[in-house]
Amino acid sequence: MTHATDLALYHFDTCPYCFRVRRALGKLGVEVELRNIYGDPRHLRDLIDARGIKTVPVLRIQHENGPDEWLGESGDIVAYLQKRFAK
């Protein structure tokens, strides 16, 4: 299992699009921090502050030398994960 410390997935448990991303993470053997927007109000506030909306899933990518990237849309997130982690 690979733990990607630069990634965090903003989600909620019953969201089908979030499930799609979590399933892809499992298939790729990648662990990321899961931030449930309804389980912790700080996560919801961070998401709204960054994107202006609370739509999930969103993958927060923390770049070493630059601003964080907030990637939305489950298909785009899965494509990013496959490109980065597929063997």
Where are these regions (language model features)?
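GST-like domain detector, emphasizing the conserved glutathione-binding G-site
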Residues: T2-D13, F19-K87
